[in-house]
Amino acid sequence: HISEMIMQIHHTKHHQAYINNLKACTEKLKQAEQANDVAAMNALLPAIKFNGGGHINHTIFWTNMAPSAGGEPAGPVADAITKEFGSFQAFKDKFSTASVGVKGSGWGWLGYCPKNDKLAVATCQNQDPLQLTHGLIPLLGLDV
């Protein structure tokens, strides 16, 4: 369970900061492009990746949240988890271990690999997006 206050702060402060910073960076990028200032454009790339990733990751995170939700999945999701990990409990154990193992700030993910049609648990540092980092389509994200 995550308290409403924590979620409000996360949504209105943290996520909003990523959006605001990304907008500011993209405006600076536009100005640098118009001035043909390649050095300024390159200098903005880390901030664009960080804030853009923060926005992408948190947007996915909110779609995973619901009041009074929880429990084991059903249907095709449950079948895919059981096929890949053996059981829902085995998935939870692997997901938890991977997420707790993130050093500093980052994300724990359940993702889908379209190349081999399998689910996978992965982690990303800071706000690196899962699809760009591991080539996985994000299904479930945990901000750690």
Swiss-Prot record:
<comment type="subunit">
    <text>Homotetramer.</text>
</comment>
<comment type="similarity">
    <text>Belongs to the iron/manganese superoxide dismutase family.</text>
</comment>
<feature type="binding site">
    <location>
        <position position="58"/>
    </location>
    <ligand>
        <name>Mn(2+)</name>
    </ligand>
</feature>
<feature type="binding site">
    <location>
        <position position="143"/>
    </location>
    <ligand>
        <name>Mn(2+)</name>
    </ligand>
</feature>
<feature type="binding site">
    <location>
        <position position="10"/>
    </location>
    <ligand>
        <name>Mn(2+)</name>
    </ligand>
</feature>
<keyword id="KW-0496">Mitochondrion</keyword>
<comment type="function">
    <text>Destroys superoxide anion radicals which are normally produced within the cells and which are toxic to biological systems.</text>
</comment>
<keyword id="KW-0464">Manganese</keyword>
<dbReference type="InterPro" id="IPR036314">
    <property type="entry name" value="SOD_C_sf"/>
</dbReference>
<keyword id="KW-0479">Metal-binding</keyword>
<dbReference type="GO" id="GO:0004784">
    <property type="term" value="F:superoxide dismutase activity"/>
</dbReference>
<dbReference type="InterPro" id="IPR019831">
    <property type="entry name" value="Mn/Fe_SOD_N"/>
</dbReference>
<dbReference type="GO" id="GO:0030145">
    <property type="term" value="F:manganese ion binding"/>
</dbReference>
<dbReference type="InterPro" id="IPR019832">
    <property type="entry name" value="Mn/Fe_SOD_C"/>
</dbReference>
<protein>
    <recommendedName>
        <fullName>Superoxide dismutase [Mn], mitochondrial</fullName>
        <ecNumber>1.15.1.1</ecNumber>
    </recommendedName>
</protein>
<dbReference type="InterPro" id="IPR050265">
    <property type="entry name" value="Fe/Mn_Superoxide_Dismutase"/>
</dbReference>
<dbReference type="InterPro" id="IPR001189">
    <property type="entry name" value="Mn/Fe_SOD"/>
</dbReference>
<keyword id="KW-0560">Oxidoreductase</keyword>
<dbReference type="Pfam" id="PF02777">
    <property type="entry name" value="Sod_Fe_C"/>
</dbReference>
<dbReference type="Pfam" id="PF00081">
    <property type="entry name" value="Sod_Fe_N"/>
</dbReference>
<dbReference type="GO" id="GO:0005759">
    <property type="term" value="C:mitochondrial matrix"/>
</dbReference>
<dbReference type="InterPro" id="IPR036324">
    <property type="entry name" value="Mn/Fe_SOD_N_sf"/>
</dbReference>
